[in-house]
Amino acid sequence: MVQMTRRGFLLASGATLLGSSLSFRTLAAAADLSGAFEYSGWENFHRAQWSWDKKTRGAHLINCTGACPHFVYSKEGVVIREEQSKDIAPMTGIPEYNPRGCNKGECAHDYMYGPHRLKYPLIRVGERGEGKWRRASWDEALDMIADKVVDTIKNHAPDCISVYSPVPAVAPVSFSAGHRFAHYIGAHTHTFFDWYGDHPTGQTQTCGVQGDTAETADWFNSKYIILWGANPTQTRIPDAHFLSEAQLNGTKIVSIAPDFNSSAIKVDKWIHPQPGTDGALALSMAHVIIKEKLYDAHNLKEQTDLSYLVRSDTKRFLREADVVAGGSKDKFYLWDVRTGKPVIPKGCWGDQPEQKAPPVAFMGRNTNTFPKGYIDLGDIDPALEGKFKIQLLDGKSIEVRPVFEILKSRIMADNTPEKAAKITGVPAKSITELAREYATAKPSMIICGGGTQHWYYSDVLLRAMHLLTALTGSEGKNGGGLNHYIGQWKPTFLPGLVALAFPEGPAKQRFCQTTIWTYIHAEVNDQILNSDVDTEKYLREAFASRQMPNLPRDGRDPKVFIIYRGNWLNQAKGQKYVLRNLWPKLELVVDINIRMDSTALYSDVVLPSAHWYEKLDLNVTEEHTFINMTEPAIKPMWESKTDWQIFLALSKRVEMAANRKGYQKFNDEQFKWVRNLSNLWNQMTMDGKLAEDAAAAQYILDNAPHSKGITLDMLREKPQRFKANWTSSMKEGVPYTPFQNFVVDKKPWPTLTGRQQFYLDHETFFDMGVELPVYKAPIDADKYPFRFNSPHSRHSIHSTFKDSVLMLRLQRGGPSIDISSIDAKTLGIKDNDWVEVWNDHGKVICRVKIRSGEQRGRVSMWHTPELYMDLIEGGSQSVCPVRITPTHLVGNYGHLVFRPNYYGPGGTQRDVRVNMKRYIGATPMSF
């Protein structure tokens, strides 16, 4: 038996016991420490343990909104420690952002050195999902992909190739790599913000923007905060301290959530409505504010369409074309009390149609695409209430009313606190008190999260919330407004990102809408919502009018699916249909990844990507206004490569395949573009100028006014603040808050009316009964006893870190589903039992956790565990269908038009009901 000294034991064990670090020795080197060493005291060991030869910038390039700057320490080519950098510049009179981090981020090294790491290219030899692979060389794997790419273009069409990668803000160089490749070969790319259900569609409908939100330091400026469907102490850990500090500063905080979650236990008041009834609660608050005249009338007149006139005969806006020969259909009227006449206000869409039309751009309208002009009213005093007579162009006299008159009459009749109490379960007295407090505290803020966003009618709910901010005049003020923190969606330097990802311009890129793409190609057309909504009809109309894309064109099936930086299959709603109907259509599935996740498991070729600490990229978020970077602490381990280098290498192999097959060029008639596959590498690298990751990162910075002048060397020194932003200007030492361009500077809102638009006079909105904010109950197509919820976990970022041993040790060691103690007793279920949860869409079999904070009639399974993790069958998405809301298909209505991640159908993983029973059957040896 080999003898080991105490020093040898300490050094060897240090390789695995450093918690948030690793020994500078590799495990292989540690094996050599079994020989005898002369004992010379313990002090030098501790000194050496924290010594390093390299210190670099690091960030965690995952679908996380933290964007937490870190330092990474390495020695002899091994990362030994990671820690928060604590060097974000402070705001004036505001608590610091520093240090930023959470339990997940400090596990980043686990994916470098853990068993999850992909080391070599792999090619499947068994069935998809079976887990049988063989090691391949890079040349073999890339040639296999390149041959299929060229053959698909030649024999089918370039848009039969599909490239998916989400959230560009966290790693824009990596994101741009595959999108630039798709751009030059004619493939289509995917939306993600809407597919995840995170896109605030109601904000786009109301405000004409993809979205915008205050950085979290601005929470401290608020005097009253409502956490509505948001659980920031669990899902926004780096920023939650601003809430506690605001409380200490006198801010009152209210949580509106069905369950008694980790944020609810820390607030001043907890309101717990029935799931999905938040719209009734919001509109009953509006009832109180209007009834008691607590609203800001001037704000409604200037900043909203509530003073615009609506025809009583057609229910449409009164347009200039109705009254004046040759008048515009995009100019509208209000009633001027001072003159007693109808007046067209400044800022309507028709004022400058060439500047108002939404540009053909990635992620829609942002930053430099807003209209010119002003919306100040001058001497005009618009009427909010009343009925007036107007003579039309044909001589006919009709009655018109301001939008506010119509809205008020409905809310007064339909949305009393007493009626809302019966729907929500919240007492009328509590609703009235909440409304008064919110309306009278200045400034007041609503923070909304996924709990309000992932519903079939989430757009109408968000419009109701925006109505509250409009009534109180809190939008565009520090400490106020409606701020949504759902998803990692905001690449502030968007023009630079677009320049790198789509060099010939977004107008020459095929964008598919992922919800529609999945609905069509996974053949979930049998997901009938109810007898009142004909989804297929609206979908056909959207395709016929080209309001929404249907890719591949001409009814073809997708053939090649390249996925990177995203666990697409694991996140997919309609998972049963995806595996049964979509996956067999795909002749090649490629996954580029740092680890073997569920999507990789069901792929044909898996390519190993460099870890976040082995590559150079940028990292930004909507939660603060600073740019981070990550840079190589060590060279990419094993045979991994950065995403940028992988797609450059693939482009070279496509060139070779095209030359081999004699198919170097083809005419893409849609774009009148003769594509040259034999020159792909030069196109990808701009003739070599972008051959390195660092050059690509600097290119992004240089091509956006928000970051021009910022260099990588400056980012190595410390995080740099953006110089400009989207809907407000940047002010030194002041937290960013959105919409000041419109509220303070009086620029027109980028909507059809030039204001926050609450009345949407489009046929589809009339069909659905949602031309104004109304309460719409959850869709209950599945008649089962429990409402299913899939919240985000404290111990993972979506599926990332779900399989980290360090995180599993902090919980039950695997996925589980929560149920109330009363419901569990009724079902005869005990804590940690195996249970079967099912509906018409699928099933999941997992452990159960009895949680006293869970509401009766609801069960919650933490979002997207890996499909191979202690699950007998299915996952959290197995019971979720793909459902399309018809209003999300509207296009060519002013600001409502499809643009990737700007407007389109979203995910509806909350309108789901399930049944549950104790599982009787064989169970694996597990936690």
From Swiss-Prot:
The protein's required cofactors: [4Fe-4S] cluster; Mo-bis(molybdopterin guanine dinucleotide)
Enzyme class of the recorded protein, top EC level: oxidoreductase
Post-translational modification: Predicted to be exported by the Tat system. The position of the signal peptide cleavage has not been experimentally proven.
GO terms under cellular component: membrane; oxidoreductase complex; periplasmic space
Family: Belongs to the prokaryotic molybdopterin-containing oxidoreductase family.
4Fe-4S Mo/W bis-MGD-type domain boundaries: 53-116
Protein purpose: Component of the perchlorate reductase that catalyzes the reduction of perchlorate to chlorite and allows anaerobic growth on perchlorate as the sole electron acceptor. Is probably also able to reduce chlorate to chlorite. The alpha subunit is likely the catalytic subunit.
Name this protein carries in UniProt: Perchlorate reductase subunit alpha
GO BP of this protein: cellular respiration
Signal peptide positions on this chain: 1-31
Consequence of gene loss (knockout): Deletion of the pcrA gene abolishes anaerobic growth in both perchlorate and chlorate but not in nitrate, indicating that the pcrABCD genes play a functional role in perchlorate reduction separate from nitrate reduction. Deletion mutant strains are still able to grow aerobically.
Main location as per UniProt: periplasm
UniProt remark on cofactor binding: Binds 1 [4Fe-4S] cluster.
Assembly, per entry: Heterotrimer of alpha, beta and gamma subunits.
Organism lineage string: Bacteria, Pseudomonadati, Pseudomonadota, Betaproteobacteria, Rhodocyclales
Subcellular location field: Periplasm
PROSITE patterns: 4FE4S_MOW_BIS_MGD, TAT
